[in-house]
Swiss-Prot record:
Record organism: Histophilus somni (strain 2336) (Haemophilus somnus)
Coiled coil stretches, renumbered: none
GO BP term, example: DNA repair
Record-given protein name: Protein RecA
CDD domains from the UniProt entry: RecA (cd00983)
């Protein structure tokens, strides 16, 4: 029977052989690094970046964004592209739905001249293009819009009444098996947009499910459930949506965080609105009655006027955002406690209003 010293030597020799054959980092002890240094790309929403725990969507991983129609899925991914391009990264958009509006994308801050776009004929072609872009190592962000539109070639070439049971699910499973290793090696962020469907005959539990089988649920490091929960009105005119995003899966930070933010038509995510709300919540912006003040200076009566002040003073807005980002990402527990306090206060006010 081998002694502990002999076992340690044998293990060291085996690890050395594995690293020699497969390269440095092929195998390591989990406790060697206290914290995984994961590069992230901002989503364009400060509150969502904080909820994700690392400041955005993780590079070198697969992300799924799903939700009902007109919930803001494409808007959120275009916002990710805009933030990535600002950081000097190369982005590609695989438009399987053939529905990308370049004018709207430009309004959200996307440099459409530099954006790579493909409108494939079928699901196999879309996933092959995605694989080629990832393998090149030259593309940093790939968006696939959407999984539901990745129609297998056999289905397109077949008759209307033909049944193709599980064909799309098998296609996704095979593609993800190929992609997942290459995505890590190339440090590319791949985002799949997905739609939801209703499962027939479900009596107990949630009847909603996403398209394309279960493979994407397993391979995705982050899954975001995005919903429209209300409308933003200016008088009688609807000018945007109240949007709620729940982090239903997160392999790089604690999951199940939930955030609300505004998406304004023609503008995208309301950055200044988030700065005001988060600033008040974390006591960087003072609110007294209807008045908001920042660093001792009154910036507006009502949230709309405070947002206008930030829009007119971009330097101050950038400083406030940097303060919030550094404070909340360095202390995620503080952000979580502030969310819980705000939620409990809203619940108390609702109970009081009932009486």
């Amino acid at each position: 029977m081998a002694t502990p010293e002999e076992k340690a030597k044998a293990l060291e020799a085996a690890l050395g052989q594995i690293e020699k054959q497969f390269g440095k980092g092929a195998i390591m002890k989990l406790g060697e690094t206290q914290k995984l240094d994961i590069e992230a790309i901002s989503t364009g929403s400060l509150s969502l970046d904080v909820a994700l725990g690392i400041g955005g969507l993780p590079m070198g991983r697969i992300v799924e964004i799903f939700g009902p129609e007109s919930s803001g899925k494409t808007t959120l991914t275009l916002s990710v592209i805009a933030q990535a391009q600002k950081a000097g990264k190369t982005c590609a958009f695989i438009d399987a739905e053939h529905a990308l509006d370049p004018i709207y994308a430009a309004k959200l801050g996307v440099d459409v001249k530099e954006l790579l776009i493909s409108q494939p004929d079928n699901g196999e072609q879309a996933l092959e293009i995605c694989d080629a872009l990832v393998r090149s190592g030259a593309v940093d962000v790939v968006i696939v819009d959407s999984v539901a539109a990745l129609t297998p070639k056999a289905e397109i070439e077949g008759e209307m009444g033909d049944t193709h049971v599980g064909l799309q699910a098998r296609l996704m499973s095979q593609a993800l098996r190929k992609l997942t290793g290459q995505i890590k090696n190339s440090n590319c962020l791949v985002v799949f947009i997905n739609q939801i469907r209703m499962k027939i005959g479900v009596v107990f539990g949630n009847p909603e499910t996403t398209t394309g089988g279960n493979a994407l649920k397993f391979y995705a490091s982050v899954r975001l459930d995005i919903r429209r929960v209300g409308s933003i009105k200016n008088g009688d005119e609807v000018i945007g949506n109240e949007t709620r995003v729940k982090v239903v899966k997160n392999k790089v930070a604690p999951p199940f965080r939930q955030v609300d933010f505004q998406i304004l038509y023609g503008e995208g995510i309301s950055r200044n609105g988030e700065l005001i709300e988060l600033g008040v919540k974390h006591k960087l912006v003072n609110k007294s009655g209807a008045w908001f003040s920042y660093e001792g200076e009154k910036i507006g009566q009502g949230k709309t006027n405070a947002m206008k002040w930030l829009a007119e003073h971009p330097e101050q807005a950038a400083i406030l955002e940097q303060k919030l980002r550094s404070e909340l990402l360095a202390n995620p527990e503080k952000a979580l406690l502030a969310d819980l306090e705000a939620e409990s206060e809203s619940n108390i006010s609702e109970v009081e209003s009932d009486f």
